[in-house]
């Protein structure tokens, strides 16, 4: 029988529900259980694919091409599993599915209502996650905060699941905040009490309360929360701010969260062996070297927009006992005149993906600097396209070379729409998305990084290198080191006369893991260390 764990949040958003869910997933996996995990987002967008990163942070892409919440990146990195389109569900997806069924006549003329039709659709997404993966445990994080009107159908659905599958097969974990009032020198439990009261008014009694706090919580405070919220004092789990995200599973294990979960759900399984994870955390806390990586992007005020890139850099750093000092460079501020000053301290330069023309010329200047000054460079998606444009303009001499995305009238469309995208009108869900094969050329930096001829990476793009320009670019030392197996699509480019200059059309950051760094990031950091 599959077991179901629901993680909710109260008091404020951004409490770390996703990290809590991911950490618990890691602990249960290390107990020998087959775990899957999903995120329910209460917004009406079908997916975050067309949302601004300022609104939502990074869009994380799964193997099967779903554009999803950034929490799925945490889930994959912590639990070391590959998720799919069933792992991110939004209100928009639920209502779209129900309306489609109504139009098809599936409800036989009945009145379609939030209960039971919307809630049944939500429950089906929970059960499907377990069926598709044969999971022992399905962990579902409910986005938003208890009390928000948007979350109500999701909370009602997870309340009903207890009756559907039996209370011994369902567990509710509620994440709250105990704020520290500096002026009074006190921590306050009242917001937690009210949040749990709100949850209980909706018919959900939490089994565990995970409390975010800046300061250590005295035992009597845990007992007070337990008394007012009607749970065992041992089930009040303190989640203090950690020096590294990867320490959170160990913090939760110390307080026996995984044991509490297994006892409640009647799961007979071994103790979690966290030896390798402890070694990782020990390594992260004692890095002896530092390298400076300039990340040149347009959303640098919000690091969450590049969270998988940042984590992939850190993972690569761990492999070399190196702390990555990221220098956030706003591409809009980069010009020909100031680029040397802005990037003079960088040991490596990275230009990540993005959409829209804001900051494009600044990124091109940063790429030119990396090429001319022989600074290790990694370009991702748009970064690869702009590296091609920079080379075409300044080495090949194709004046006005650009992407037709930014300049439809460019005389040299180095980057152009994929042929299959020419007649596409909708923006949402229509990109080239998900895992595709790439064939690497022997003797190249990319081949050296992967050590394999055919690799698989995740994509999210609509534009592609224009093959008409391949011959002239190659004549000038531009290397097409990776293509689709049929040779039609350019996937990886590099430069002949440069120590380490590689750019990929795909998104390598999505497949990096803390104990298994992604090959391009690993070699980029190695080159940046000047070893």
Curated annotation (Swiss-Prot):
InterPro entries: Class_I_gatase-like (IPR029062), CTP_synthase (IPR004468), CTP_synthase_N (IPR017456), GATASE (IPR017926), GATase1_CTP_Synthase (IPR033828), P-loop_NTPase (IPR027417). GO terms for cellular component: cytosol. Residues 292-531 form the Glutamine amidotransferase type-1 domain. Pfam families: CTP_synth_N, GATase. Keywords: ATP-binding, Glutamine amidotransferase, Ligase, Magnesium, Metal-binding, Nucleotide-binding, Pyrimidine biosynthesis. Pathway: Pyrimidine metabolism; CTP biosynthesis via de novo pathway; CTP from UDP: step 2/2. CDD domains: CTPS_N (cd03113), GATase1_CTP_Synthase (cd01746). It is an enzyme of class 6 (ligase). GO terms for biological process: 'de novo' CTP biosynthetic process; pyrimidine nucleobase biosynthetic process. Residues 1-267 are annotated as: Amidoligase domain. CTP binds at residues 13, 148-150, 188-193, 224. ATP binds at residues 14-19, 71, 240-242. One of its GO terms (molecular function) is CTP synthase activity. Its EC number is 6.3.4.2. Homotetramer. Catalyzes the ATP-dependent amination of UTP to CTP with either L-glutamine or ammonia as the source of nitrogen. Regulates intracellular CTP levels through interactions with the four ribonucleotide triphosphates. Belongs to the CTP synthase family. CTPSs have evolved a hybrid strategy for distinguishing between UTP and CTP. The overlapping regions of the product feedback inhibitory and substrate sites recognize a common feature in both compounds, the triphosphate moiety. To differentiate isosteric substrate and product pyrimidine rings, an additional pocket far from the expected kinase/ligase catalytic site, specifically recognizes the cytosine and ribose portions of the product inhibitor. This is CTP synthase. It comes from Geobacillus kaustophilus (strain HTA426).
